[in-house]
């Protein structure tokens, strides 16, 4: 139901398909990706936690996009979307000291620098971004 578990599930199904040659879930992967890309992002690159509401925005919300685009071999097709989401994430979720915030929400946001949850996952996502787009 949420953005990052949806992306993670698509990644897992794709890995299964590629490693086994079993294409029986391929139409489900395509339908799931179509839902993911159409419903979890605003036009300006803002990620939505759930398909029907934005808040809270966890760092995994924008980060998962880059992993999923790479693993589903859709990076070229969705480059403009990826660039919008990366700009949004850096502008809104990166501290001026370089680390990434855990979560933005109305009222009180958690701008704590968690090594595993926020930074490691966003650095992983940025690695895929650099690998796919060379920036």
Region spans (language model):
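Glycan-recognition and catalytic cores of secretory/periplasmic carbohydrate-active enzymes
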Residues: 1-135
């Amino acid at each position: 139901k949420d953005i990052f578990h949806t992306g993670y599930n698509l990644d897992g199904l794709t890995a299964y398909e590629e490693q086994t040659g079993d294409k029986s879930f391929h139409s489900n992967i395509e339908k799931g990706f179509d839902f993911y890309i159409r419903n979890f992002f605003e036009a300006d690159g803002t990620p939505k936690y759930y398909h029907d509401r934005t808040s809270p925005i966890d760092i995994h919300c924008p980060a998962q996009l880059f992993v999923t685009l790479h693993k589903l071999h859709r990076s070229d097709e969705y480059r403009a979307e990826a660039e919008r989401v990366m700009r949004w994430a850096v502008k809104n979720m990166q501290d001026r000291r370089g680390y990434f915030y855990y979560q933005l929400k109305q009222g009180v946001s958690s701008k704590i620098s968690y090594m595993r949850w926020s930074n490691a996952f966003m650095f992983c996502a940025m690695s895929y971004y650099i690998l796919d787009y060379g920036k």
